[in-house]
């Protein structure tokens, strides 16, 4: 009947709070990670904080509530590896903290429509519209948050403590510090990737030391040449030592992360467009 049965009682929601938030943990079995990615799998994960079970249609949603800095301990150890250098972990802490606060701020202030139709063109932006019951999800759609077992080194705690509360700010506004592990050698502008608006600090840049270098990738021939090349940029590395230090083990399984290939049949493309847009083009 759409309720949770617990100790012979029916509930719409259950909440379990720790007796000692510093020590008590709970274990969740078969958590799906990498949803819809090629490396999707299940993990048993251990968490701290409050656990809520909430009914949403035919599903039960598990929501973990905890302090931001505790959350970030897991994030910087799940997105990357806890064995990363202290400098990388500190930078990641500031970036992930900034991104989190920016998302919460946007949800609180935004009433923007995600779908617009202009002539024969339909534009739909996908972001945090799936998360109505909680601030952020625990997977790659937002930030990986895979529990306390990922925090395997003392330098993770040190990175959080030494950057406590630090965020990125641009012109007195909190930065939406979106990030990825690999950009393919050049980043995309915010307006053509996430939302139809300009963000001054999220512009297209080449992933190398020469900050003044510009790439014009606005033509078919230019982008084809770029994709088929193997430029000397930061994220184009096959150094096994570096990768084993900074990447979680399942990320290391993918060796062609810089240049990769995916083939779709006509039917698969049609199905994908229909699923995303709601329009059947045949």
What are these regions (language model features)?
Residues 1-282:
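Conserved, single-site charged/polar hotspot
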């Amino acid at each position: 009947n759409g309720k949770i049965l617990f100790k012979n009682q029916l509930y719409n929601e259950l909440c379990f709070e720790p007796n000692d938030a510093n020590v008590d943990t709970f274990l969740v079995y078969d958590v799906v990670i990498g949803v819809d990615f090629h490396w999707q799998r299940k993990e048993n994960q251990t968490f701290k904080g409050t656990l809520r079970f909430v009914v949403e249609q035919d599903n039960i949603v598990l929501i973990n509530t905890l302090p931001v800095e505790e959350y970030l301990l897991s994030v910087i150890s799940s997105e990357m590896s806890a064995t990363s250098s202290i400098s990388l972990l500190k930078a990641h802490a500031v970036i992930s903290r900034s991104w989190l606060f920016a998302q919460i701020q946007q949800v609180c202030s935004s009433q923007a429509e995600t779908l617009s139709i202009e002539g024969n063109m339909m534009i739909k932006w996908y972001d945090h519209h799936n998360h109505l019951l909680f601030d952020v999800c625990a997977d790659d759609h937002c930030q990986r948050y895979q529990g306390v077992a990922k925090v395997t080194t003392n330098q993770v705690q040190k990175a959080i403590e030494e950057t406590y509360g630090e965020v990125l700010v641009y012109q007195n506004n909190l930065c939406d510090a979106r990030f990825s592990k690999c950009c393919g050698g050049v980043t995309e502008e915010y307006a053509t990737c996430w939302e139809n608006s300009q963000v001054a600090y999220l512009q297209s840049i080449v992933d190398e030391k020469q900050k003044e270098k510009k790439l014009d990738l606005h033509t078919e021939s230019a982008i084809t040449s770029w994709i088929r090349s193997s430029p000397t940029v930061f994220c184009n590395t096959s150094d096994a030592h570096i990768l084993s230090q900074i990447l979680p083990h399942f990320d290391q399984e993918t060796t062609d992360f810089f240049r990769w290939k995916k083939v779709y049949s006509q039917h698969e493309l049609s199905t994908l467009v229909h699923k995303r847009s709601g329009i059947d083009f045949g």
